[in-house]
Design a protein with these regions (language model features):
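Gram-negative outer-membrane beta-barrel transporters
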Residues: 132-273, 277-286
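Residues that define the transmembrane beta-barrel architecture of outer-membrane proteins
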Residues: 7-9, 113-115, 190-192, 254-258, ...
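Solvent-exposed loop/turn elements at secondary-structure boundaries
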Residues: 1-184, 303-314
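A short acidic (Asp/Glu
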Residues: 39-41, 221-222, 289-291
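Juxtamembrane/interface motifs at transmembrane-helix termini
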Residues: 47-49, 152-153, 229-230, 293-297
Length: 373
């Protein structure tokens, strides 16, 4: 069952205030509430993976001298008895198995929405240089997420990994079937950015500009995945379980971006002109499974039983002594000289603690959980 299609409204308002005289200084801003949409391929999954049996009707008439008309074959049989009584019915030898990953759509599912606001100042500097600074803030409402229905927390069962790290432990009602639910999350996801830019236009046809943007965003998930199964797992690292709809840093926003452009234009022969331009973009950003800008510190295996992936965020110990409560064990291996060596539990604890101290992020998260990157 698909959700209803109500009328939606996206109101917005903006202003442009000249504060320093014509073409010298402008204060501008706007705010609005915008209705978006979720990936429609997720909704399609609710139909194609509905959990109901589906079959194809094939009309076969081998002795026909001409193709049958549409009216002769476009018969719809609403009951099984009518389908079986059709002489042209072709049934498969083996019945189709029911989908193992049916998709359920929340009956109250709402389209994604964003409240977005911006405030900027444009100033004319000496030597006819245009300077702008702009801040943008947005907050998401009803972002769409995917959860599972056969893995759930009963409100009691927990797992203690260390005295400071106790988490929910999920129960699986049926391991042979994994139904997914498309639903809405909360209102904590947000985005903010600040941009500084300079631009200069010369009389002889040269235009140059430079801008720098710092930004960050937190989301319930990146919304990636052409299937609900991948939307449930991709960049959904969490402390307790993916079903808890925890927020973390979005992986699709460049934290820092420098953009420099230069172009030269020349008119000639009254009706012709040529422009040559150069663009430089520098950013610590890459959205690729093997080269993402951000990453998450997680356990090598799943510890809360929400699925088989390594999606549980690491707890960063507050002290070296706290590692004595962790489950380390001696590791024996054969080195390059074919000699057996032992990597003791104490050595592993020391190395792990040294790694935490040399990393600026982990060092600042002592006694806390790592954040989703």
């Amino acid at each position: 069952q698909l959700p209803d299609a109500p009328v939606t409204v996206s109101p917005r308002v903006g202003f442009n205030w000249v504060v320093l005289g014509y073409q010298k200084g402008v204060l501008r801003g706007c705010t609005g509430y915008f209705i978006g949409r979720l990936p429609f391929v997720w909704l399609v999954s609710g139909v194609s993976n509905s959990g109901c049996g589906q079959y194809q009707y094939s009309y076969i008439q081998a002795d026909a001298k001409s193709l049958p008309t549409f009216g002769e074959i476009s018969k719809f049989y609403p009951t099984v008895a009518e389908q079986l009584s059709d002489s042209g019915l072709s049934l498969p030898k083996e019945p189709n198995a029911a989908p193992q990953t049916p998709t359920i759509i929340d009956k109250d599912l709402k389209m994604n929405a964003t409240w977005k606001s911006s405030l900027a100042v444009d100033v004319k500097l000496p030597y006819d240089i245009n300077f702008s600074v702009e801040g943008i803030y947005s907050r998401d409402f009803n972002p769409s997420v995917v959860t599972t229905q056969n893995y759930y927390w009963d409100g009691k069962k927990t797992i203690t990994l260390s005295p400071e790290d106790t988490r929910h432990y999920l129960t699986c009602s049926n391991k042979s079937v994994t139904p997914y639910l498309i639903t809405n999350a909360g209102h904590k996801a947000h985005y903010e950015s600040l941009t500084f830019s300079l631009a200069k236009k010369f009389d002889f046809g040269l235009d140059i500009s430079a801008s720098y943007t710092m930004a960050q965003a937190k989301s319930y998930g990146d919304g990636i995945g052409d299937q609900v199964t991948s939307a449930y797992t991709n960049n959904r690292y969490s402390v307790n379980a993916n079903n808890d709809k925890e927020i973390g840093f979005a992986n699709y926003v460049a934290p820092n971006r420098l953009l420099i452009t230069a172009s030269y234009s020349k008119d000639y022969a009254k009706h012709f002109g040529t422009m040559v331009g150069l663009v430089y973009e520098g950013t610590n950003f890459g959205y690729d499974p093997y080269a993402a800008t951000r990453f998450s510190y997680t356990f090598a295996g799943n510890v809360v039983n929400d699925y088989k992936g390594s999606n549980n965020l690491l707890y960063v110990p507050a002290s070296r002594e706290a590692l004595d409560e962790w489950n380390f064990s001696d590791y024996t291996y054969t080195d390059a000289k074919k000699q057996k060596q032992t990597y003791t539990a104490e050595q592993q604890k020391d190395d792990f603690w040294n790694y935490i101290n040399q990393d600026s992020y982990l060092k600042g998260r002592k006694g806390k959980y790592a954040e989703r990157g």
